[in-house]
């Protein structure tokens, strides 16, 4: 009866061919879906149900390619526009439950865990991503078991914090969030530290490590970041803090901090570049007693899961990043979700830094950015422009004229006194890098007229470069390190 009822409901509904040409889908999505239907579907299944299984599988993997960890059936049903009607979320759940070898249903104990997809309420996962979420959640529960209930530092702890960092010498811990973050780290094995650029995350991180080494001189510390570039910046930022912020640190602790070498998470976890399997795991955990990860918002769901699996049982973990930053290129918004989770269930393990110490003098720009982050409607760009001009005259509005976007870019470079043809005279790689570092064009989006892809092409026109020929002096980005 259930199958007959579902078939009647879905007979006039959407078919795979109606979705194949949509830009959110790739041919690989439909190849994956066809494989699921071929290997996991019952031979006696109604054709309409098989088509819905195919659509669900293709859409689930399409979501992963677009950096989501799963397909939210409820949202998708409300947002997907098509000539034929979509089943509602309840109908999707009913149909998918008819294919237990393809879809594991979490609320059904009889459902085989080996299925390639997993249904959790209205969320349809590729099973390995659901397993990643479960591993991260299990480790977070371990951290929550010994979470502090109060975060008031002792007088001795406050004295140590003030003594070790000159910025905190006369600071009030009730008002200074950086001091609060340091104090929280002393009483908990987990700290998530989030804040925008210039809010002092590196200062907090360095002070925490200095205090730990002062108390435990032989503590093993591992520093990591998602990319080699981020790891390099981490090293430079720590060196800068050691030169300008830390005071009263014993020579041995200073040497230990100077010797710390941040590495990529892939290298830390000994991930095989061919298989993606981590050499460090639950059976062979890391040897570090304190693990510090920077730029966490760039870390994917799978990489976060591998990190959590490799942590020793009693290790301390400090996660640093900006939860409002763009998400990982791969699936998941893990750091943001962890911050949201801790804010609800364990606020003593979360600290949010809001004061911008780097750009604090530029009040107009800081207020504008804060309005965007806070979601207080769309800020008025004209007010921002007027404020910036009154402050230092740096804002220029360049309307597009007959010369188009390329002409506007050329005028911008000329107004900023950037010698357009200087790249042709670069006699060495060092000079070429220096020219590239003279200016940067930032885009809010990747695609579209004002996106990264198009503006890079326009810049090639401005500079007289033929991108397909890769001329000397043309900047390139390495997308994969296969060494």
Where are these regions (language model features)?
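Intrinsically disordered, low-complexity N-terminal extensions of AAA+/P-loop NTPases
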Residues: 1-87
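Interdomain "pre-motor" coupling segment immediately N-terminal to P-loop NTPase/helicase cores
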Residues: 85-156
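Short helix/loop segment immediately N-terminal to the Walker
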Residues: 150-153, 170-173, 180, 278-283, ...
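ASCE P-loop NTPase helicase motor core
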Residues: 179-182, 186-389
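Conserved helicase motor core of P-loop NTPases
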Residues: 324, 328-475, 480-483
């Amino acid at each position: 009866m259930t199958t007959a009822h579902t078939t009647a409901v879905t007979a006039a509904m959407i078919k795979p061919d109606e979705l194949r040409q949509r830009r959110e889908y790739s041919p690989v999505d439909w190849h994956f879906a066809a494989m699921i239907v071929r290997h996991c579907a019952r031979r006696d299944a109604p054709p309409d149900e098989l088509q819905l299984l195919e659509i669900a599988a293709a859409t689930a993997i399409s979501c992963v390619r677009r950096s989501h960890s799963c397909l939210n059936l409820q949202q998708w049903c409300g947002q997907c526009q098509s000539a034929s009607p979509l089943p509602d979320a309840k109908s999707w759940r009913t149909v998918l439950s008819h294919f237990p070898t393809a879809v594991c249903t979490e609320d059904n104990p009889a459902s085989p865990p080996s299925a390639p997809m997993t249904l959790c309420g209205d969320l349809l996962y590729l099973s390995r991503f659901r397993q990643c979420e479960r591993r991260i959640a299990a480790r977070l529960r371990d951290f929550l078991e010994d979470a502090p209930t109060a975060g008031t530092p002792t007088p001795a702890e406050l004295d140590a914090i003030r003594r070790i960092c000159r910025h905190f010498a006369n600071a009030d811990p009730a008002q200074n969030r950086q001091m609060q973050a340091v104090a929280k780290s002393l009483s908990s094995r987990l700290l998530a530290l989030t804040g925008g650029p210039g809010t002092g995350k590196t200062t907090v991180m360095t002070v925490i490590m200095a205090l730990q080494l002062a108390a435990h001189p032989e503590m093993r510390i591992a520093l990591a970041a998602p990319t080699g570039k981020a790891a390099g910046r981490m090293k430079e930022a720590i060196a800068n803090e050691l030169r300008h912020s830390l005071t009263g640190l014993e020579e041995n602790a200073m040497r230990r901090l100077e010797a710390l070498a941040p590495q990529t998470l892939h290298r830390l976890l000994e991930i095989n570049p061919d298989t993606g399997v981590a050499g460090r795991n639950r059976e062979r955990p890391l040897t570090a007693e304190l693990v510090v990860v920077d730029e966490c918002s760039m870390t994917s769901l799978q990489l976060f899961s591998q990190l959590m699996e490799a942590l020793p049982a009693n290790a301390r973990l400090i996660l640093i990043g900006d939860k409002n930053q763009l998400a990982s290129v791969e699936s998941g918004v893990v750091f943001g979700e962890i911050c949201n989770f801790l804010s609800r269930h364990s606020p003593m393990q979360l600290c949010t830094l809001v004061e911008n110490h780097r750009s604090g003098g530029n009040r107009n720009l800081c207020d504008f950015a804060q309005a965007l982050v806070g979601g207080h409607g769309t800020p008025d760009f004209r007010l921002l422009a007027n404020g910036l001009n009154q402050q230092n005259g740096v804002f220029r509005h360049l309307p597009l004229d007959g010369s188009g976007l390329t002409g506007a870019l050329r005028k911008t470079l000329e107004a900023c006194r950037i010698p357009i043809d200087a790249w042709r005279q670069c006699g060495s790689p060092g000079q070429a890098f220096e020219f590239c570092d003279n200016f940067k064009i930032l885009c809010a989006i990747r695609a579209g007229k004002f996106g990264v892809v198009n503006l890079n092409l326009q810049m090639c026109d401005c500079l007289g470069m033929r991108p397909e020929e890769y001329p000397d002096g043309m900047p390139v980005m390495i997308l994969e390190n296969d060494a």
